């Protein structure tokens, strides 16, 4: 399957990634991506950017080198109540927010605690995507989370990077994907790139989705406008006109 969108990418601003915004855009253009999300880590990540970075996206272009640009954040969930490490006044300015659990920002809890964190964060209307919920460091009740995502119209990410960097993720990601298929919940495949050469490349995630027969209509990033319409329907991207 050809993917035209990657909403989960990092720049050197994240502190442990290795390419710049412009290098990422150039690579996205080179491989034919139509939409690129820049979602650097929130400020509680060691080495991450401060809030001024996220509050200054007004200076950034909407399109560059034939690529529509989404300026967002992979925000860290910092407690089991679903609190994020960026305040509401920043959240409302962003094009896209991925909410993720990272063990350097919150201690892994019990299945009940981790599930509660994800359930609670989906009550936040600015959250668009749950990031890498297949991470075995944070065991969850996958079916409860998937059903809540459908109720709250939140996208479930299938994170290609998890297959490589988070040992044991493959089985959980497959379980999550099968539940999304069962309950007809929209998913989005993300590279979680920390260097430009990973952008738009989802081989392991794509192979798994093919293996389980994931319906293409549930995959948001196999067309350019699916993600843009999704975000506009949430009141975002007000400056963007869709042809």
From Swiss-Prot:
Per its UniProt entry, what is the enzyme's top EC class, as one word? hydrolase
List keywords of the entry alphabetically. Hydrolase, Metal-binding, Zinc
Instruction: Identify the residues that bind Zn(2+) 1.
Output: 8, 10, 74, 192
Supply the PANTHER family for this chain.
PHOSPHATASE YCDX-RELATED (PTHR36928:SF1)
Tell me its cofactors.
Zn(2+)
InterPro entries of this UniProt entry?
Answer: Phosphatase_YcdX_put, PHP_dom, PHP_phosphatase, Pol/His_phosphatase_N, Pol/histidinol_Pase-like
Q: Which CDD domains match?
A: PHP_HisPPase_Ycdx_like
Native source organism of the sequence: Clostridium botulinum (strain Hall / ATCC 3502 / NCTC 13319 / Type A)
Q: How is the cofactor bound?
A: Binds 3 Zn(2+) ions per subunit.
Q: Which GO terms describe its cellular component?
A: cytosol
Q: Cite the GO molecular-function annotations of the record.
A: phosphatase activity; phosphoric ester hydrolase activity; zinc ion binding
Which of this chain's residues are annotated to bind Zn(2+) 2? 16, 41, 194
Membrane-spanning ranges? none
Similarity comment text for this entry: Belongs to the PHP family.
- Report residues binding Zn(2+) 3: 74, 102, 132
* Enzyme Commission code(s) on record: 3.1.3.-
Q: What is this protein called?
A: Probable phosphatase CBO3379/CLC_3322
């Amino acid at each position: 399957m050809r993917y035209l969108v990657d909403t989960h990418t990092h720049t050197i601003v994240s502190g442990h990634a290795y390419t710049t915004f412009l290098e990422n855009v150039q690579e996205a253009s080179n491989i034919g991506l139509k939409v690129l999300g820049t979602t650097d880590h929130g400020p509680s990540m060691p080495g991450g950017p401060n809030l001024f970075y996220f509050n200054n996206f007004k200076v950034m272009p909407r399109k560059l080198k034939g690529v529509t640009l989404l300026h967002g954040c992979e925000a860290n969930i910092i407690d089991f109540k679903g609190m994020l490490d960026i305040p509401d006044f920043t959240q409302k300015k962003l094009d896209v927010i991925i909410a993720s659990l990272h063990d350097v920002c919150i201690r892994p809890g019990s299945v009940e605690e981790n599930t509660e964190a994800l359930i609670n964060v989906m009550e936040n209307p600015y959250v668009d995507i749950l990031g890498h919920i297949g991470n075995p460091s944070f065991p969850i009740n996958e079916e409860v989370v998937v059903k809540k995502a459908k109720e709250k119209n939140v996208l479930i990410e299938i994170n290609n990077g998890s297959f490589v960097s988070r040992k044991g993720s493959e089985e959980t990601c497959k379980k999550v994907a099968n539940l999304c298929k069962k309950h007809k919940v929209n998913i989005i495949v993300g590279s979680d790139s920390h260097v430009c050469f990973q952008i738009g490349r989802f081989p392991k995630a794509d192979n798994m989705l093919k293996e389980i027969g994931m319906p293409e209509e549930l995959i948001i990033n196999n067309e350019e406008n699916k993600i843009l319409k999704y975000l506009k329907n949430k009141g975002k991207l007000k400056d963007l006109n869709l042809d």
